[in-house]
Structures are given as C-alpha cells and as structure tokens.
Amino acid sequence: MVYANNNIDPNAPCYVSECAELLSDKVGGVVLGCTDQWFAECVNLIKHSAPVWDAEKYVDTGKWMDGWETKRHNPDHDWCIIKLGIPGVIYGFEIDTAYFTGNYPPHASIEALCDDSDPNFNTLKESNNWEVILNKSDLGSSCKKYFECKVEKRFTHIKFRIYPDGGVARLRAYGRVVKDWTLVIPGELVDLAAIENGGLVTQVSDHFYGNKNNIIMPGRSVNMGDGWETKRRRGPGNDWLTVKLAKEGIVKRIEVDTNWFKGNFPTSCSIDAIHSSSAPDETHLQDYEWTNILPNSPLCGHRRHFFQNELVNNDKPFTHIRLNIFPDGGVSRLRINCSLPDSKNNNNNNNNNNNNNTSNSFKTSDRQQ
C-alpha cells in the first residue's frame, strides 16, 4: 500500500506528484525583476516552503504577507520575470493565493521563452520571444488553482502577469527536466538520481512526514522536515521508495545521508536496481525482479554514509533504483553517482534523446483534469 502525505493536496492533478518542480528557490529559481512589490517582495513567490500567516505582524508598508503583493489601483497590470531553477518542459502550474482574501488578483497569465545565454532582466523585458503558455485565467480567494500547460517545449524563463494588481502567495511550475548531456565530460560520475539532472521519485511506501522528492533535492537538508520520513511501522515489513534515474547509468558510488535524523533514522538500508527493458510496465515496478546492488548495511543518525566497495552486481546499466529502509525512519538525501554507458554515438544521439524525452513525456491524455 502507498500512503499519502498529509501535506499534499488530494485534489491536485497528477503532474504535481509525478513531475519535478522547476521553479522554486530550492532548485535554483531566481526572480529577476518585477513591476512592483510594494507590500510583499516578489522573491516570496518561489519559496519552496508553504506560505504562512501571522495575524499580528505589520511592517512599514502595511500588513506583512508571505507572498508577492503589489500596490492598489494599477491602471494596467503587474508582472514579474523568473528564471527557472531547472530548464525543462512545463506540464502544469499551481497558483496559490493563500491568505490573500480581499487583495488577490482576479486573473493571471503566463508566458515563457528559452534562452541559455543567461540574459538579464532588461534584456528579457524587451524580448520579442515570449510565448503565451497560459491564457488569462481566473484566480480565487485564498486557494490553489491548477492550470495545465500544453506547449511541449523546453523553457528557461517565465513571465507571470497578474490583472490588475494584488497578491499571490506561491507559483509552482511542474514538468520534465531536459538536460544537455553533451556537457558531461566522458568518464565523469553523474548523480542520476538528482532532480536537477532529471531524476524523479516515482513510487513510495510512505511519506507521512516529508515530501518524497526532498530526498533528491540539491544540497544537504536544512532541517528534519527537509527530508523523507515515514511513520513508525507497527507491523512487519519495511519502507521503500523508487527513483527513476535521469538516464541509464552504471552505479559506481552511493551516498545515503541521514542529516538531522537523530532518534528516527533507519537502522539499516539496502538498494536494488532494475532496467526498464526488463520491466515494461513502470507503474508496477514492484512486481518485477530487482537486482540487489547494495546489501543490507547499517546506518547511523545525522551522518553521511558512502558506499563504493560494498556495491555488488553493478557492472551493467540500470534505469531505476529502489532504496529499502529497515524498518522505517528518515533519510534526508540519496545520491546515485553513475558513469554513463560507452556509446560511439552518444553525443550524436543526445539531441534525439532530449527530443524523445519531450515528446513522450506525460501526455495530455494521461493527466488528471
């Protein structure tokens, strides 16, 4: 059985749980500029953390709000430009007006472009390359609204417009990471589980206390809530999660980090792997035969554990790994450092691989409405 996290919106479309969040500050998103931020700074819009409310807090400009809020009486509309933390194909947006009740904007729209030259705000605001990917849409009072994006292209920046003014707590963009693999040095080890490279947690036995995707986020965890933690297991068995690697790779080194988990870390862990060629139905990976690559190994609290000489059966490429923890507990980060299989045509095929990732990913017919 797979248990739901209490912090996840049960009404959210499936791209929220099945895709990477490309925009937040946690993955490197940056607000480059905006038309106005009188009441609350635009950087709040891409905070990884959920918005909070403080009824008693006021600042020099007025009521403190955990979001982006502009002045009243704009004769036109406000907008901001944000650089995605991870370039990719966007499948949907989440616009959250939490705690903005009488001051939310009635409508919003979004445009996007792709520019890897790292342009500045002034260049971007004058650009003619913006493409509408979300038409002007209705927002609501203190609620989350979800909007599907049907433009199957790689983007690096978005322009978020609100009409005419007001406050939005958070903006999320969910999609598929598209990485340029030609930039990888031959022989270099790459963390193929990392979200910034295109790794994704696909299945989990339980993530009651922490979002499952925390485990593949950049950097070390900042606190216990910034990891993956399961409930106390009262019956037999153990907890686990599966990660779809960014691409097939030969596992060379593994890191399991229990940072901040001191009285609630797993006593041990093991890791299995599988290649999708032997498991055609990725939605039922648990039903297929997995290869053990890390035998059951003891863990300690609040520590980084590195495994290299302990690895077994790791002489061939895999596409998915499964982290088993015994019996339950918390892990903050998982790193699966791999070498890429040798291929004479590897560089020539990279563009084709990226195109395939774009066209075959998360089809509209597979999305929840």
Curated annotation (Swiss-Prot):
Family, according to the entry, reads as follows: Belongs to the allantoicase family.
The segments labelled Disordered in the record are 341-369
Its encoding gene is what? allC
Which keywords, in A-to-Z order, does the entry hold?
A: Hydrolase, Purine metabolism
**Job of this protein:** Utilization of purines as secondary nitrogen sources, when primary sources are limiting.
Q: Which NCBIfam families match?
A: allantoicase
Q: In which pathway does it act?
A: Nitrogen metabolism; (S)-allantoin degradation; (S)-ureidoglycolate from allantoate (aminidohydrolase route): step 1/1
- Its Enzyme Commission number(s) read 3.5.3.4
Name the domain of life: Eukaryota
- Compositional bias (Low complexity) spans? 345-357
GO MF terms on file?
A: allantoicase activity
For this protein, the parts annotated as crossing the membrane are none
Record protein name field: Allantoicase
Q: Name one GO biological process term.
A: purine nucleobase metabolic process
Catalysed reactions, semicolon-separated: allantoate + H2O = (S)-ureidoglycolate + urea
The kind of enzyme this is, by top-level EC class, is hydrolase
